[in-house]
Design a protein with these regions (language model features):
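N-terminal maturation segment of proteins
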Residues: 19-464
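N-terminal export leaders
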Residues: 1-2
Length: 464
């Protein structure tokens, strides 16, 4: 399965270039600060495998780290501190400086944790993402469940009825390639009109198993992505639509491709060639990816899109046009309450890692409050318990809340342009929250709730 065809292009920027990883293209030579930031991230990845989610920058920096002696975590924490001290005199652009500062707080936190300076779970999240999550009141989930209950046919336990409803709209694995290719093409066309596409971008999609996530974007550089869709559990049509938009257009693939073309290629900000998990950039990236489907498919087209997915997937319900449309309408009506219900994952992570609940207690919470069937609850908890994703679980829900508020403080007609900024700029959660506050103050009638950025972290994680 593939998206758009086209050959990758070298970075079009004046000045010296150097071979990128993979050896098929060049990138600008990084300035000293970006070089040392990249080295720090790659060195940390040797201690925390998977921290580097993607790297498409200079090949010699990766080779340097591969050949050198493993650097102690305490030394890496000192390296991060030294970079923070250098920021004011070496990085002139305010947005770039703020972005690097937030990233460095996270990297310093990870290094200090490795060195034995562990933080409480909430503090670890705050230092990692420049954002403090909040525990949801279970009444929110009860209200969402009541909305879903009213929309579902039949009687009996809600979890059973919801599982039975979802089973009617599962896409058979052998039909996934056809449906995914069609969705990718459709969403790419929409994204091209709204946001433009870098010349030569492309992606390919594969089906995988035995993963803790539903979908994953591996960005290779050269404007190329590999997208994996996990088939461990049945995939319902509406979830497939969300996942494809999230991972491709206008989600992760388009974000990474534009940032490579613009930030790295045109502006020479080589730090953006290193994609790091558990850093503030993830909160923004996941927020835009979650909301991407709302730009990929306008609200007035959602029902028609689902009906066509049912047809292309060869679902039995597609043979009855009226039943298919009714099913799509109910599914769309359940979208927002189901999203609210999914925020029970935030509480589950807090219960597990902050409150000290057992695996079984957390599993029971997900099934009771989140209305998840046992197999899906186990898969969610597997993700929550993974060392690398134990804090990452928050970025989907918190990122969506933050980015949605940021979009909604401007008129609807301005939101595609505003969303486009997320594809091109180095924005931090703190900067986005500040823009929300400024817009809300200027337009109090908009009624936007205040955003909740983290307070400025102490000079040393865990310090006073």
């Amino acid at each position: 399965m593939t998206g758009a065809a086209g050959a990758p292009t070298d970075a079009a920027v004046g000045g010296a270039t150097t071979p990128a990883v993979g050896g098929e293209r060049n990138v600008p030579v990084p300035d000293p600060f970006a070089r040392d930031y990249i080295l720090l991230g790659i060195r940390l990845d040797q201690h925390i495998p998977g921290l580097v989610d993607g790297y498409f920058g200079p090949a010699d920096l990766k080779a340097q780290v591969d050949m050198e002696q493993l650097r102690a975590p305490s030394r890496l924490a000192e390296d991060a501190e030294a970079l923070v001290a250098r920021l004011p005199r070496e990085v002139a652009d305010a947005q770039r400086r703020d972005w690097l500062a937030a990233q460095l707080v996270a990297l310093r936190t990870h290094a200090s944790t490795l060195a034995g300076d562990r933080l409480p779970y909430i503090d670890e999240i705050t230092h990692s993402f420049a954002w403090t999550p909040i525990r949801r009141d279970d009444a929110i989930f009860d209200a969402a469940a009541a909305e879903i209950d009213a929309l579902l046919p039949g009687s009996g336990p809600l979890a059973d009825r919801l599982a039975a409803w979802d089973a009617r709209f599962e896409v058979a694995v052998d039909r996934l390639p056809t449906v995914i290719d069609w969705l990718v093409g459709r969403f790419r066309s929409t994204a091209s009109v709204l946001f433009g596409l870098p010349n030569g971008e492309d992606l390919r999609v594969s089906l995988v198993t035995d993963r803790p996530w539903s979908g994953y974007n591996a960005y290779d550089g050269g404007l190329r992505s590999r997208v994996d869709i996990n088939t461990d559990l049945p995939i319902r049509a509406a979830d497939l639509v969300d996942t494809v938009a999230h991972e491709t257009y206008p989600g992760h693939h388009l974000e990474h491709a534009w940032k490579e073309a613009d930030l790295v290629g045109r502006q020479g900000r080589l730090e953006s060639s290193l994609i790091l998990l558990n850093t503030p950039e993830c909160l923004i990236s996941e927020g835009l990816a979650v909301l991407g489907v709302e730009f990929a498919t306008p609200p007035d087209e959602e029902v028609d899109l689902l009906v066509e997915v049912y047809e292309r997937a060869g679902m039995a319900i597609a043979s009855d046009r009226g039943a298919a449309r009714e099913g799509a309408e109910r599914t769309v009506a359940m979208t927002m309450p189901r999203r609210r219900l999914a925020e029970s994952r935030v509480n589950a992570a807090l219960i597990r890692h902050s409150d000290g609940a057992s695996h079984d207690q957390t599993l029971a919470y997900l099934q009771r409050v989140g209305q998840y069937p046992p197999q899906l609850a186990e898969k969610i908890l597997e993700f929550i318990e993974q060392p690398l994703s134990r804090t990452y679980v928050f970025v989907y829900h918190e990122g969506e809340v933050l980015v949605r508020r940021w979009l909604e403080v401007v008129p609807a007609g301005e939101r595609p342009g505003r969303f486009g900024r997320l594809l091109h700029e180095q924005l931090t959660p703190t900067a986005v929250a500040a823009e929300i506050a400024a817009a809300s103050a200027a337009l109090p009638a908009a009624g936007a709730a205040p955003a909740r950025a983290a307070a400025a972290p102490p000079s040393r994680p865990g310090g006073g």
